[in-house]
């Protein structure tokens, strides 16, 4: 959640996807839309700020994600790839754009009506993979290379985040394919043949970079928790006078995991 005023100034410090302060807003929007709205989505952060009566909301001229912000600085274009945009606001699978019915529902909420902006006016434009997302400007080139050697004019694709990048990198963008990303957070992405028939709060409905519907299962913690456990094992060993190489320790633990049951003993996150 990165909201900006009309001068392009950031109104509040960047609120990341791990900033789980939007429980009230996420629950209310999920009920209003009959569509699961996770706490980390941009629209949940915006609505929570409204419910909290935060002063900055009245000044918002534009809000975006980190990927959208960087792209804006490089090209001057206020756009997002559809996969990244689906983590800001629900996407209509047929139009591959924001769900217009839900846009109207949001604007009609009593707490929202007092603001002069309409939601669609402050959201980035949605683009699908392959569309022109602008070119590197002189200002953008200087941000990347202060020496001035990098030339402007390079065409850029619609900006996506790590989820869209992972789908493309693993060739998991076709229907009935999927991938798992294990990093700071961990999540599974499965490309669906058709939309779900009911709301499941365990499943976040997002899209591929080309706009196909994806069911996402997301957990906030992965390697951060793992690092804590590995650190504990190292500390244990060192207390017995054993010097441990962290690379070797990680390697042994990862390889040991391969000996486990294929269903992880029934363990479910």
Predicted regions, residues:
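Active-site core segments that coordinate phosphate-bearing ligands/cofactors
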Residues: 6, 23-84, 89-116, 130-269
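Carbohydrate-associated surface elements
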Residues: 19
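N-terminal cofactor/phosphate-binding cores enriched in small/glycine residues
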Residues: 1-2
């Amino acid at each position: 959640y990165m909201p900006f005023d009309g001068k392009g100034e950031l109104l509040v410090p960047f609120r990341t996807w791990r900033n789980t302060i939007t429980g009230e807003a996420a629950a209310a929007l999920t009920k209003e839309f009959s569509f699961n709205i996770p706490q980390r989505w941009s629209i949940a952060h915006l609505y929570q700020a409204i419910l909290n009566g935060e002063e900055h909301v009245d000044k918002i001229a534009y809000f975006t994600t980190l990927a959208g912000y960087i792209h804006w600085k490089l090209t001057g274009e206020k756009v997002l790839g559809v996969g990244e945009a689906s983590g800001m606001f629900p996407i209509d699978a047929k139009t591959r754009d924001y769900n217009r019915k839900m846009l109207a529902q949001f604007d009609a909420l009593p707490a929202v009506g007092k603001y002069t902006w309409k939601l669609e006016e402050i959201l980035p434009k949605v683009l699908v993979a392959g569309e022109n997302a602008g070119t590197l400007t002189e200002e953008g080139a200087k941000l990347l290379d202060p020496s001035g050697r990098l030339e402007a004019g390079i065409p850029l694709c619609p900006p996506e985040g790590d989820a869209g990048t992972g789908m493309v990198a693993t060739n998991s963008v076709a229907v009935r394919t999927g991938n798992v990303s294990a990093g700071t957070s961990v999540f599974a992405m499965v490309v669906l043949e058709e939309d779900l028939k009911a709301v499941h709060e365990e499943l976040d409905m997002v899209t591929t970079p080309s706009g196909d519907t994806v069911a996402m299962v997301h957990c906030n913690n992965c390697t951060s928790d793992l690092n804590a456990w590995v650190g504990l094992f190292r500390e244990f060993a060192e207390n017995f006078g054993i010097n441990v190489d962290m690379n070797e320790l990680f390697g042994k633990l990862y390889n040991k995991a391969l000996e486990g049951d294929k269903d992880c003993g029934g363990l479910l996150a």
